């Protein structure tokens, strides 16, 4: 096989993954996407195979997440390059282990190290889990109802095993070796989980207490308008929304950073904004959840946190992208999965002394945002709400901590206008369906210029808005206190995978380092 053919084959693999990806994709193609890479690994023997793998994965990344370029060209190219490089390293390690050990151990290593790579993208500072294999089924929720037991890594495992079995069957065909047993195994692995899932989907009865909800989608352009609107302007907008639509006895949610002017934490409870909202709630018997920018000014260096920003001599500021809840008491939560390069500098202690403060400016203050260490559910006498802010909604195990803290509904507030009419905001809405299944919780979602809506605990859309539409959705959702297997045990598939990676890679190293006889 020459290099041009190898490049063509891995490019086809990358395009198969793109063609499978939601929301426009045909998901069964994901069961074929890895086969071209496995084929090249088997039949291409040149030393530049790393580059061949990289090109295929890069094609997948740039075509699947092209919408990132609408917000930042640099961020788009950086994310695609780093992610493709990591995928290539994983596949190259698989190649080395397979050659040194044997085919069976090699394939087990590929499955387990790929899962570990995906988990890394959920926890490290350059976090970018958008292309985790398990996300690919978000528009076909009838087939992955078992995510309540496995989370998205169950989907990743399914994709990897199926690709490997299909490749082995094809490889045996080329060699004239019968594959009857492998074919039966493949059919079982494809059909049995699908039947089980469809059965759950058809028989699942959603339980819970019915609640009233009004979801506001203001449709404000974040590039030109949002950060020039005062909190008082938005307060008047909020008041008019409630009174013109006669909203009473309801939970009302507004999107991320709806109040973007900034409110000092030590005065938020007593300031004019909070007092007026509480008066409105008292008058109309409502409760309000909204995005807000909170901050605190520090004058004592002993009180500094890792995300504190210096703004003068002996003065620092902590800024938070927060959610605030006005009920019979007032509560707040700080977004803690921050967007790399926009809300936080990765590995700040290392990079900031070298690069300085180089966060991208999309409005507001271009300073590192703060976070909190624990998830926190808002609780009142009427509601138990998990306040999930934007990017946090794509982290499965992370969200289970809200449920463990008493959250009975997943409330996502976001601002998805950065990417225009692309797959970006559509995929972000679609991925919320996975969280609904994993936790068996309803999702209520307020997006500023995105897609707002309600998703039930099977992952079905109950109601949703269009993009670029100023509107209010009024409806009902259900709160329940279900604790799923996945909520209880989290990403246990990753922990099992890590065990196998350590064992197999240690064995590989022992073979590599041992003296030849």
Positions of predicted regions on the chain:
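Short, well-ordered coil/turn elements that cap or connect secondary structure elements
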Residues: 125, 208-210, 283, 438
């Amino acid at each position: 096989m020459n290099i041009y053919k190898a490049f063509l084959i891995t490019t086809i693999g990358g395009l198969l993954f793109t063609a499978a990806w939601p929301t426009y994709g045909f998901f069964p193609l994901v069961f074929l996407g890895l086969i071209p890479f496995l084929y090249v690994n088997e039949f291409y023997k040149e030393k530049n195979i790393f580059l061949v793998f990289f090109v295929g994965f890069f094609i997948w990344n740039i075509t699947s997440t092209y919408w990132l370029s609408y917000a930042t060209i640099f961020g788009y190219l950086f994310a695609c390059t780093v992610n493709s490089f990591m995928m290539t390293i994983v596949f190259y390690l698989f190649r080395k282990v397979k050659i040194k050990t044997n085919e069976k151990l090699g394939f087990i290593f590929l499955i387990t190290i790929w899962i570990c790579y995906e988990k890394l993208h959920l926890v490290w500072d350059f976090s970018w889990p958008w292309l985790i294999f398990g996300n690919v089924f978000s528009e076909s929720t009838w087939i992955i109802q078992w995510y309540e037991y496995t989370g998205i890594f169950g989907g990743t495992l399914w994709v990897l095993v199926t690709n490997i079995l299909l490749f082995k069957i094809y490889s045996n065909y080329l060699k004239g070796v019968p594959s009857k047993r492998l074919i039966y195994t493949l059919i079982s692995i494809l059909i049995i989980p699908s039947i089980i899932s469809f059965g759950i989907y058809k028989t699942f009865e959603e339980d819970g207490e019915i609640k009233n909800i009004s979801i506001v989608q203001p449709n404000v352009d974040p590039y030109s308008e949002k950060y020039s609107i005062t909190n008082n302007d938005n307060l008047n907008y909020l008041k008019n929304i409630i009174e013109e639509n006669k909203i009473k006895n309801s939970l009302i949610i507004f999107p991320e950073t709806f109040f973007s002017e900034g409110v000092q934490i030590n005065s938020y409870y007593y300031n004019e904004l909070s007092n007026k909202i509480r008066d409105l709630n008292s008058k109309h018997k409502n409760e309000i959840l909204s995005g807000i920018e909170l901050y605190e000014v520090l004058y004592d260096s002993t009180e500094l946190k890792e995300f504190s920003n210096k703004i003068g001599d002996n003065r620092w500021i902590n800024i938070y992208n927060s959610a605030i809840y006005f009920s019979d008491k007032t509560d707040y939560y700080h977004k803690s999965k921050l967007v790399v390069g926009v809300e936080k500098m990765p590995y700040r202690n290392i990079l900031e002394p070298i690069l300085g403060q180089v966060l991208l400016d999309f409005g507001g203050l271009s300073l590192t945002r703060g976070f909190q260490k624990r998830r926190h559910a808002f609780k009142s006498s009427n509601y138990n709400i998990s306040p999930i802010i934007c990017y946090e909604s794509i982290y499965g195990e992370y969200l289970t901590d809200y449920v463990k803290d008493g959250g009975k509904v997943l409330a996502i507030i976001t601002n998805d206008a950065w990417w225009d009419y692309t797959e970006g905001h559509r995929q972000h809405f679609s991925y919320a369906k996975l969280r609904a299944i994993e936790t068996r919780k309803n999702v209520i979602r307020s997006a500023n210029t995105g897609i707002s809506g309600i998703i039930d605990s099977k992952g079905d859309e109950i109601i949703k808005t269009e993009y670029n539409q100023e509107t209010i959705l009024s409806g009902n959702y259900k709160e329940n206190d279900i604790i799923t297997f996945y909520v209880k045990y989290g990403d246990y598939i990753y922990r099992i995978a890590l065990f196998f990676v350590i064992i197999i890679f240690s064995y590989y190293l022992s073979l590599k380092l041992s003296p030849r006889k």
